[in-house]
Amino acid sequence: LLACLFGNGRCSSNRDCCELTPVCKRGSCVSSGPGLVGGILGGIL
C-alpha cells in the first residue's frame, strides 16, 4: 500500500495503479493530477 501511495508501484498499464497514482509511466505508477505531488513525481520520473 505504501509503495502505491508513493507512486512506486510497478505496472504494465494504468489499471495496475491506485487512485493516488493512477497513471502508468515507464513501468511505474505516477500521479496524473496537478499540484505538488504530481510535480514531484513527474520530475523524478
Swiss-Prot record:
Disulfide bonds: C4-C18, C11-C24, C17-C29
Superkingdom of this protein's organism: Eukaryota
Tissue: Expressed by the venom gland.
Primary location: secreted
InterPro entries: Omega_atracotoxin_CS2, Toxin_23
Signal peptide residue numbers: none
Keywords (A to Z) from UniProt: Calcium channel impairing toxin, Disulfide bond, Ion channel impairing toxin, Knottin, Neurotoxin, Secreted, Toxin, Voltage-gated calcium channel impairing toxin
Gene Ontology terms: cellular component: extracellular region
Gene Ontology molecular-function annotations: calcium channel inhibitor activity; sodium channel inhibitor activity; toxin activity
Localization annotation: Secreted
Keyword Disulfide bond belongs to the record: yes
Transmembrane stretches, start-end: none
Entry remark concerning the domains of this protein: The presence of a 'disulfide through disulfide knot' structurally defines this protein as a knottin.
Known function: Potent inhibitor of insect (bee brain), but not mammalian (rat trigeminal neurons), voltage-gated calcium channels (Cav). In vivo, injection into lone star ticks (Amblyomma americanum) induces curling of all eight legs into closed loops, followed by death.
Family: Belongs to the neurotoxin 15 family. 02 (omega-actx) subfamily.
Protein name: Omega-hexatoxin-Hv2a
Biological source species: Hadronyche versuta (Blue mountains funnel-web spider)
